[in-house]
């Protein structure tokens, strides 16, 4: 079964939302959708219609059509099952089933279609699972929003307090005016100007009678209700005049955020943006990406709670003509290694000859700029001796200080790049005192985390240490330690040894890249 496109169109054939699952030009998909209303007869009970090249499987939804475009060799029963799933998803994301409602929720519908259909094949998911996948709730995002809302509420309380103080001063000034202490006659209106983070004002005087009382009137400005403003109110003061603009306060606010560990993106010149090195797109017709992700939990006293390696072989083909290929692979015989192939891959050929090829030889691999995962594998049951990086933390309290010694030891089989060891610290007023370190360090005051960075760990520095001092703290405060790194080799050592063309001619040129990434690596 191959679903070419899933679309929602109007009765006249106007495309509202369309998601293509194969490489198809815009002109072709618009032509197919525009031709559909002419093929549907009135009063017929069929849910599909066929042409010379494609099959339309459809369902009316109020004044619209929910439509699947498939090839004629697809299984009509599976197509109808896919259509039923999409018909349940559309009302979940677009309660208003008209042109305006569908267009407003176009992106949500496309995301839902992607979760229901992959590479033209229906995924074994339910409506509830699709909604859960599309929500993508993040605990870190929720915590960040709560923290920002707390700051907003705190700022609002400060502004209310300042406003209350100004109102109190205004009432006191009114009493003084009635008592004859002011030399300015007539009513006054006190104008309060609030900045985003504080209350600001000018240093205008309010009368000669009040000058002898020693009251601080810099926090507000007064202006007569009617008539022209007086010269005293309009003339700029010397040294105490109102400062227009927020440049100085904005800079101070940004500096305070930087001190708390926030990442501030500042404006840069276009020339500097263009000068940044951007990753080059693949130039070879075929690119193979081999990636393994580590999920490791190590006990602080020794031993491993969890050691899981998950790998993926993904293929990127730039041109359709180069998609008629098979990949010959090889790997090390690692205990606990198990493979899982894509449903469209010939499993018998893979298990017997370690060849990655499509079930249908006449069907090429998908082409374009996106990678297609073909093979996945998992390695379980490895012990502590197989860890690429071991980290030990030794905190000790001595008097009014806590001395923390941390050391790492890397395995011989990997050269590790961009290593970052993040140690949580107790809440501190200032950065910890780092006495000795192999590498570089940075203190994130906002999250109270000390980051130890090593650019490269190879034969020259398989081990290293760091020592720092903080105020007295419980030893458990410095855990869990999070570790991040990458390597250019993998545990399985899986690689492509050659490409077999399925059609006459030379095999296309190919490149491959392997990477090991620490997705979740902790010492607890």
Curated annotation (Swiss-Prot):
Q: Which SUPFAM superfamilies match?
A: Second domain of Mu2 adaptin subunit (ap50) of ap2 adaptor, SNARE-like
* Any single Pfam family the record assigns to this protein: Adap_comp_sub
Annotated MHD domain ranges read 283-524
Q: Where is this region: Disordered?
A: 215-244
- Which cellular component appears as one GO term in the record? COPI vesicle coat
Record key words, sorted: Cytoplasm, Cytoplasmic vesicle, ER-Golgi transport, Golgi apparatus, Membrane, Protein transport, Transport
Q: Which GO terms describe its biological process?
A: endoplasmic reticulum to Golgi vesicle-mediated transport; Golgi localization; protein transport; retrograde vesicle-mediated transport, Golgi to endoplasmic reticulum
Q: Which InterPro entries match?
A: AP2_Mu_C_sf (IPR036168), Coatomer_dsu (IPR027059), Longin-like_dom_sf (IPR011012), MHD (IPR028565)
**What Gene3D superfamilies does this protein's entry cite?**
3.30.450.60, Mu homology domain, subdomain B
Write out the annotated subcellular location. Answer: Cytoplasm; Golgi apparatus membrane; Cytoplasmic vesicle, COPI-coated vesicle membrane
Q: How does it sit in the membrane?
A: Peripheral membrane protein
Instruction: Tell me the domain of life.
Output: Eukaryota
Principal localization reads cytoplasm
Indicate the family of this protein.
Belongs to the adaptor complexes medium subunit family. Delta-COP subfamily.
Its biological purpose is as follows: The coatomer is a cytosolic protein complex that binds to dilysine motifs and reversibly associates with Golgi non-clathrin-coated vesicles, which further mediate biosynthetic protein transport from the ER, via the Golgi up to the trans Golgi network. Coatomer complex is required for budding from Golgi membranes, and is essential for the retrograde Golgi-to-ER transport of dilysine-tagged proteins.
The UniProt entry, under PANTHER family, shows: COATOMER SUBUNIT DELTA (PTHR10121:SF0)
Quaternary state and interactors: Oligomeric complex that consists of at least the alpha, beta, beta', gamma, delta, epsilon and zeta subunits.
Task: Kindly provide the name given to this protein in its UniProt entry.
Answer: Coatomer subunit delta-1
